């Protein structure tokens, strides 16, 4: 896993819905157990009621692991976008504009591609675009990840896709992300297939 995330110092997890709490905690735990110093930072609106929930599981402003959405995006080498579909449709131009060149955009659903195709726009060419879609609800992704610490093979399977590889490392990042969130098996798909299902 350290090789898959080589050069990624910060992963920004944007949102705190069903998938975000599970994926953020699983990533943080996986990075720690692999001896990696990659930081997982949650990006939320400052007035979001979800800030209290993120703080309750150890993501805080004091530790630099909780911040404002666009500040987190601009500082992250990988941005995992786990906000609602409506928020993605509204905010994607600002989100993409805020990302660093060479960063990786991670999605857990293909919805954004459909929105962008409908709008007649494409992803920036200087970023990676990958998908990891766990095949279960967020709470089960976390519960089975924790169970997997003592029961070999426990976890939620996931699909993964590489939609755009700007750096030559997008495949490694996608597979590493799937492993880090606890998928015992990951199967290849496309971003388009994930939103047309």
Question: Language model features by range: what are they?
Answer:
Residues 45-46, 55-114, 122-137, 146:
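Rossmann-like NAD(P)-binding element
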Residues 1-62:
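NAD(P)+-binding Rossmann beta1-loop-alpha1 motif at the extreme N-terminus of oxidoreductases
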Residues 16, 47, 84-85, 163:
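Short beta->alpha junction loops/turns
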Residues 10-12, 39-41, 77-81, 103-104, ...:
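Structural motif
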Residues 31, 87, 96-99, 174-185:
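Structural signal for hydrophobic packing residues in well-ordered secondary-structure cores
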Residues 24-25, 89, 93, 171-175:
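Predominant activation on well-ordered alpha-helical scaffold segments within soluble catalytic domains
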Residues 106-197:
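Rossmann-fold dinucleotide-binding core
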């Amino acid at each position: 896993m350290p090789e898959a995330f080589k050069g990624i110092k910060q992963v920004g997890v944007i949102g705190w819905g069903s998938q975000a709490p599970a994926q953020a905690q699983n990533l943080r735990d996986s990075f720690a157990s692999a001896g990696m110093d990659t930081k997982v930072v949650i990006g939320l609106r400052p007035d979001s009621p979800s800030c209290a929930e993120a703080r309750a599981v150890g993501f805080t402003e004091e530790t630099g692991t909780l911040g404002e959405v666009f500040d987190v995006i601009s500082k992250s080498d990988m941005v995992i976008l786990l906000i609602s579909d409506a928020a993605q449709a509204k905010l994607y131009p600002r989100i993409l504009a805020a990302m660093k060149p060479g960063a990786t955009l991670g999605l857990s659903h293909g919805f954004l591609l459909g929105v962008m195709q409908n709008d007649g726009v494409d992803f920036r060419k200087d970023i990676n675009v990958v998908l990891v879609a766990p095949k279960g609800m967020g709470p089960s992704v976390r519960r089975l990840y924790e169970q997997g610490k003592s029961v070999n093979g426990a976890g939620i399977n996931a699909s993964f896709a590489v939609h755009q590889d700007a750096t030559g490392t997008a495949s490694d990042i996608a597979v590493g992300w799937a492993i880090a969130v606890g998928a015992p098996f990951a199967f290849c798909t496309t971003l388009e297939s994930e939103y047309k299902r």
